[in-house]
Amino acid sequence: MISSVRYWFLVALVVIVYVAGMFVTLFENDSAQFAVMAMRMVQENDFINLFKGPQEYLDKPHMHYWLAAFSFKIFGIHDWAYRIPGILATLLGAYSCYGLGRLLYNKDIGKFSALIFMTAQTIVLSNIDVRTDAVLTGFSIFSIWQLVNYLEKGSLTSIILGAFGAGVAFSTKGQIALLVIGICILCHLAYTRKWKSLLSWKLIPAILVFSITIAPMLYAYYLQFDVHPEKVIRGRSNRSGIFFIFWEQSFERLSGQGHGKNSSDFFFFFHTFLWVFLPWTILALLAYWFRVKTFIKLRFQYKPQYEFVTLGGITILFFIISFAQFKLPHYMNILIPLYSILDASYMHSKYRYSKDNTIK
């Protein structure tokens, strides 16, 4: 489909773009503010309390700021040092796209999935304007890949790595990580009918690993908020950080409470997708349309050559997040790996079965 030399040349070009973007001045609002939050951790040697300016911060959990602070500790406080964890997480996400694409289809689709993911406009931007979504996206697709690998092969290592990835993603942005990972896994289980995998003893060590991974974040929230009911956060006292991250966070964004409403447009993410996935948008829309037609024609009967992780995950998650009253374009980033694999599988089928040399 694409020669190895050309493929690695294109990957190298993308990495060069990522590296060049490391030295750009940090953008306002989020990137610069998040970097300052991590810088405060290092300068005050306080890795428990989150502050945004003078205000205590109860929104996104600690992992992104810890990783940035760790980078500052090693390399010093620089714009480029802040971006290193996000870029590494993106490379992990690209490798996970390769792994999941190879697992669900074949090696060629896996390689092309990684390239599509790395070159999508919003992913390139997310490595320059680094927010929490770079780490969230990388570890979410890593978790999905490992958990699907467990369902297919019963690997203990895979389910433990999947649980670890889910824990890091949850500690980065909260419930949205578990929603995305959980729905993708449920879609795979529903399509393959491998429900017995949920009865395995291997879930016990996986749950333990997930709990250990999120424990530092929960402990930090407990110390900052739960033991200080007198603190007033967004006009309310008696705020529990643990209750917030397990329950309140996503509901506040869906309802617009706490953050305000910035868009009630149900189609916001559709017209946002038209530019965030450039230059692959049109092909992705065609891939989605033809895959829906295929599943309807098959009446959703299981066929080994197809998978429902990407199509099901995209459809359900797109529908859910469209109801949110607080929307921003980079909220789409976590779905880009799924679109990349779906897009790659569509183009591979066109290349393999089309008799039109122009398409090839």
Task: Say what each PLM segment does.
Residues M1, R102-L103, D108, S143-L161, ...:
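Membrane-interface transmembrane helices that cradle and orient dolichyl/undecaprenyl
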